[in-house]
Amino acid sequence: MDVNITLFFNDMNKKVKLAIPVINSGKVIGQTAFGTDTLFDDGQEVISHRFTAVKSGEKYVAVLDKSRYGGHFEDGTLYLSLVRGTTYCAHPIEDRMLIPDDRYTKKMDQGEHNYFFRLSVCDEIELDRKANEFNRKPYAVNVFPLGEMDAEKDFTVSVSNKNISLVTMKKSDKRDGYILRLINNYKDSQEAQITVGAATETVVFTKYEVKTLFYDGKLHQLDLMEI
């Protein structure tokens, strides 16, 4: 279920959160940079990226998002931080006045804000893929070929395991070919066949492992420092 929120915020010194009650709640997890982390469930503010999920029975109740990062979990309810109407740079230093009291001072996050969420019930192994599908919508590139060069042969890119994410595919900065970066954002090992054109490589990922491949007509595994 997709949830779109338009918020007009003109308050001061207030925080607005979206509350999502979860029945039979258990462990709370969230996406981090190239991984998944267990989050606090005692009311402390936490950070997560494209998904935050709460275990409920054998499944996870997941909130996929592309517009906010903070929140907390407390008493069976997930709270997602939306706006915070505080004063920018009002840090107390001895007896110095925090903000001038003879004029209007605008607060942070005031104005119109738009948020886009997707609520899903799924297995843990599906979280990263579903978050990518929600965040990375297909797009078109406006290209005007001049017709002065012969077109290269088309080739396709595929990953046999749908829970292995292709994070990056780019031209190499150092050699003639392409860099592919893939991640297994799950606690168990995974295996996948990576196909680029006519080249195929079987790759085994340990838990939360990132792999780098290089394509120059053939596929080669490299270390993460390759750009």
Describe each region flagged by the PLM.
Residues M1-I227:
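Terminal accessory/anchoring regions of large secretory-pathway or extracellular enzymes
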